[in-house]
UniProtKB/Swiss-Prot annotation:
One of its GO terms (molecular function) is structural constituent of ribosome. This is Large ribosomal subunit protein bL28. Belongs to the bacterial ribosomal protein bL28 family. SUPFAM superfamilies: L28p-like (SSF143800). The keyword Ribosomal protein applies. GO terms for biological process: translation. HAMAP family: Ribosomal_bL28. Coiled coil: none annotated. It comes from Syntrophomonas wolfei subsp. wolfei (strain DSM 2245B / Goettingen). InterPro entries: Bacterial_rp_bL28, Ribosomal_bL28, Ribosomal_bL28/bL31-like_sf, Ribosomal_bL28_bact-type, Ribosomal_bL28_sf. It comes from the Bacteria. Keywords: Ribonucleoprotein, Ribosomal protein. GO terms for cellular component: ribonucleoprotein complex; ribosome.
């Protein structure tokens, strides 16, 4: 579920560095929202990141 159905943005991985430079794994999760949108002419529930919502890549169902 943590993937945008429009652009495919998913979880990013990296490291967190403490003040003493101890490295621990961490992840950056995209801001995914459930949205009722028009897909192929019918309303459908999809998961979309907020960047796609703001840029108007999704036609929302009313």
């Amino acid at each position: 579920m943590a993937k945008c159905d429009i652009c495919g943005k998913g979880v990013g991985f990296g490291k967190k560095y403490s003040h003493s430079h101890i490295r621990t794994n961490r992840q950056w999760k995209p801001n995914i929202q459930p949205v009722k949108a028009i897909v192929d002419g019918t309303p459908k529930k999809i998961y979309v990141c907020t960047r796609c919502l703001r840029s108007g890549k999704v036609e929302r169902a009313i």
